[in-house]
Amino acid sequence: DKLKFFRLAFGAAGGFGSEVDPAEAKAVIEPLVTGDGRTTLEWMVPSGLMPKRAVKILLNLVLIAKDALVRGGVLHVGSELREGEQEIVIRAVGPKIIMDRSVQDALTGNLAASEIDSRTAAGWMVYGLAQQNGGLIQIAGPSGDQMVIGALVR
């Protein structure tokens, strides 16, 4: 249900505590990713609670990567908790991958606040959430048929 996705990805997500079961995240993002029939989701996120901030980052990165898969493809979504840091990796694989430069700039903190618009708002939010406590966002590609977006959430 789109409303539940938007509440969890962008809002306060009432009904959820400070941690969220990743199965809830998968349940809200999978229909949005696979609904067009051109994109599949490979979910490699272990069970167990994740900080709500990490789940927001994960959901928004999946949506951003999905938008970059112009002709569909596969989204590989993984996450791991290591030494108190949540690592998130989204790998997009498809025949045509295009990431808008302004979205990439928003994700990496290279977009002026005055340039934020509806296309870049999610990236800007993800960057801000990741920066809390010294986290970061990294992007490799698009190159050929793939692109990787990683986040470190502290």
Task: Give the positions of each predicted feature.
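Solvent-exposed beta-strand sheet faces enriched in polar/charged residues
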Residues: 42-44, 78, 140
